[in-house]
Structures are given as structure tokens and as C-alpha cells.
Amino acid sequence: MAASGRGLCKAVAASPFPAWRRDNTEARGGLKPEYDAVVIGAGHNGLVAAAYLQRLGVNTAVFERRHVIGGAAVTEEIIPGFKFSRASYLLSLLRPQIYTDLELKKHGLRLHLRNPYSFTPMLEEGAGSKVPRCLLLGTDMAENQKQIAQFSQKDAQVFPKYEEFMHRLALAIDPLLDAAPVDMAAFQHGSLLQRMRSLSTLKPLLKAGRILGAQLPRYYEVLTAPITKVLDQWFESEPLKATLATDAVIGAMTSPHTPGSGYVLLHHVMGGLEGMQGAWGYVQGGMGALSDAIASSATTHGASIFTEKTVAKVQVNSEGCVQGVVLEDGTEVRSKMVLSNTSPQITFLKLTPQEWLPEEFLERISQLDTRSPVTKINVAVDRLPSFLAAPNAPRGQPLPHHQCSIHLNCEDTLLLHQAFEDAMDGLPSHRPVIELCIPSSLDPTLAPPGCHVVSLFTQYMPYTLAGGKAWDEQERDAYADRVFDCIEVYAPGFKDSVVGRDILTPPDLERIFGLPGGNIFHCAMSLDQLYFARPVPLHSGYRCPLQGLYLCGSGAHPGGGVMGAAGRNAAHVAFRDLKSM
């Protein structure tokens, strides 16, 4: 990583962080020997769980390994003066009731909605004085159709119907996100009370079926087929298909030709912000500001959050019930229940005494698919990139496309598939798929005047290189240079604008953020690891084989993304169990 000041851009001193970032919160009253509930990990789901439990009167403590809260939803000043959303970088999926219930606006959350939201520049020679074409999509359907018509009149006419079709599927899936999956084990073998409770979990499924109606078989195909098959049924132009397909493969070690890739696309279109379906935006101050707002909501009601307090072990009594945790320094903290925001692998294979868990359960956890294609590169630049397809304004101020997700090497679905095949051979993609975002285009607080922060979400990248070779600094820099070379073709001068960079390969994402294999979802969002089967079959309702232990992170239903649903749902399940103790 290099840092230097150039042009209009001046690096400034690091700014202070909130209290729970500078040190742990013992100064707020100290660590107590006992709480009603302990949450392992201060990722956004863990913070959401703590906030709900505390509001329900459950005295809750959160223990975070790192010096900063938020997990992957964090803001870090890696280069002085530049504040990066170091891992997660966009917001849309956070459940609307969490905004309301936790009063996040009251606790400082501010959003910048993006419109337009998608920009795909072409690599083609302009005819005469014409610049290369680009595809710019936003909330104005008429303008979207005009943009798409550059490539296909037919696709322009069909696009509103496609959007309506996907919107209906998102509406059907929506109720499933806010409740535990159907508890088939309780339904088949539980007590009468357990069976009655499990019947209530069928309601979201029945509601989804009613919404989809006679179109259910067609929607089933969307969830199970390769996204290329789905998109080919709608469209003919590659720039549009490839742009849409990026949402089906982002964060997933899959090709657009992989069966089931359609669900990941749906996962990225079913969100919304401030009542706008499908809207995505930037959090003012970076993603860490969201985590700060949730933490503020939790602590205002009495929750305790401790940083640099690593949980080493879940404590179990002689009757096989959870009774608290042991910290890395040997401190014992008793509790009636433990909610783990860490991955299923860390929770069950590292923190929980193995003798208390069924062998088959442990085997299934160890077999979870955690492959990740992602390398995240955070870049400080001294000016905005100027794309051949959309040159910068004379004074260098942000233009509409700068606020978008900018898709590079994405003009054709074949490019996406070829990038995937490289990784399957143990090689970094020759032409990586790049999603480039510039949050400082809407939030100038993230960088010094005249400067910007650039988020590069790139794939595909194997965890281990061909021949079993591990990542080292030379390989890491070589890959980042390749990514920069690709950007340079679309936006000449980009490389010269770079002030510094932070390169996070899959092993780095695993080491720093605890993401298994670097997987941003904790484990793959494939159909065999969703709903009934997340993290494993018969244990998808946040409860674990060990009484009093709950999974509340992205490895639980409904999965990854900055959604908060797993934390909220797990908190409600745990609270119901606590009342019945």
C-alpha cells in the first residue's frame, strides 16, 4: 500500500472514531460476571440481535474480537484522510422494520440514494467523433428504455415487463425473510405445542404461493436455472444481459451458466431504501456508520458492547445447556443464552465443545461450501476516473454515472464465464469482473477535498492458487495491478490518480473479518444451503443442537448481505425460548 498527496488532493490526519472504536466499553460500567444473553461478534447482525433483545428487557453483552465494531459493515481509515467501507459497501437489503424498530435515523443514520444506479461502459471504437456507447440505468423507466434501445429495440420494449416480473417474485420472497424457516423436525416429531408453532411458520410460504399463483412454475425456473437461460428468454443484447447477470454471480463462485444462479440475482434485487423498491445507496460516513447507529440504539437501552474481547469458548454445564462464554484472557462470563454472529464453522467447530454436538451435524458443518471468488480493493484517488464512454466534466465534479455501480469487463456474459473458468483452474481471472463504486461522489465526508474513495469488488479469485501456492505480497500486488490495467483501458489516467490502495484477497477477508474462505455470505447462497438447509437441514431455525446456543449471522436464514434479518429473527426465537425456561 502506498500513500502520497497529488494534485488537488491533500491527505489529512486520521479522524477520531466513536468511543467503542477507540477502546472497549468497560469505562461505561465495566464487564459484569453475568448477563441474560451474550452475543459473539459485533457484526451488524449481532448488533441487531443485541438491540432487539435489550429492548425486550434481556440484559445483553456483545463481545467483539477486533478493535472496531461492524464486522464486514465497517468504516476504516486505512489511508489517512480516506474513510473506506472496507468490506461491505452498499446498502439496500436492510429490513425496513429494523429502521423503524431501532430508530436508526434518530441514532444518526443518513443515506444517499443512487439514481442512476448502474453504468456499463463499452470497449469499442467510436465512429468519427462519437464516444463509445454505455448503458446507464436508473429509476426512470422511459430513460432506461432509451438507453437499452441503443443495443436492442426489442429489449427496450420488454424491459418493463421483466422488471414487473422480478418485482412480483421479490414480493413473494419478502415474507420469508422475516421469519424462521418451517421447522420440519418439530412438525414431524415435536410436542403438540411445538407442532402448533411450526404450523404458524407455514404462513409465509402459503402467502408466497398466493402471490405467485399460476406463474409459480415459471418463477421456480428463475430460482433453479442458470441466469443465462432466464435472461435469454427475455433479452437479446449482451450488454444488458451481462449487466443484469453480474448481480447473479457477485460474491459467488459460480458462472452465469451455473444452475441456481438466478437466486443470487433475486437476492440483489429484492431490497429497497426509504420506500423505494430495489433502491441501493451509500451510508453517509461509510458502512460503519450503519453499525454505529445500530450500536447506539442497543446501548441507549442498556446493552454493553466490548471490543478487543475475543470469545475463546462457549461454556456448557453438565446437563448440556449453555451457561456462558470464556474470553481469550480466561475471563468467564455467565449467561442464560449465547447468540453467535460468527460463521457456522467458527461457532460449531472452534468455539463449541465438540462432545456436545452430534457427529452428523459437525460433519455437515465442515462440508459447507465456503468458496469465495472475491478480492476487494479499496483505492484512494486524487481525482474522479474519466471514462472514454462518459468523459469527466471540465471542472472534474461528479457526474450522474459516478454514483453508480460501474461494471467493467461486463459487456458480454461470455466474459463473466471466462473469468470464472480461470479461477476454476486456480488462476486469478485474466480479465476480472469489476464492480467499481465511488461513494465519495455523493458523500464528500469520506475523502479530502478534490479526492475520492473507490471501492473495487472484483472476481474471480481462487483461495489457493494453482499448485497449492498461497497468496503472498507479490501475487497480491500483481493481481491489483492487473485490475488497474483493466480500469485504465476504460478510464485512461486512472493509475496515475492512485494515492494508495488496500488489497483484500479471500485469505485476507477470512483473517481480518472472519469470513470462511473469504465468503461474504459466510457460506454459499446456493439452493442446497438456503431456507430449510441453512446452515444445514433440520437446524435452520437459529436454534442449535445445544440448548441455549443460537446462530444469528449470515450463515443462518435468510443469508448474507447487510440485511439484519438473521439477527432480528434469531433474537425473537431466543426470546421466546427464554420466556419458556
UniProtKB/Swiss-Prot annotation:
The gene is PYROXD2. Keywords: FAD, Flavoprotein, Mitochondrion, Oxidoreductase. Its EC number is 1.-.-.-. Belongs to the carotenoid/retinoid oxidoreductase family. It comes from the Eukaryota. The keyword Acetylation does not apply. The keyword Oxidoreductase applies. Transmembrane segments: none annotated. Interacts with COX5B; this interaction may contribute to localize PYROXD2 to the inner face of the inner mitochondrial membrane. This is Pyridine nucleotide-disulfide oxidoreductase domain-containing protein 2. One of its GO terms (cellular component) is mitochondrial matrix. Its main location: mitochondrion. GO terms for molecular function: oxidoreductase activity. It is found in: Mitochondrion matrix. It comes from Homo sapiens (Human). Gene3D superfamilies: FAD/NAD(P)-binding domain. GO terms for biological process: mitochondrion organization. FAD binds at residues 38-71. Probable oxidoreductase that may play a role as regulator of mitochondrial function.
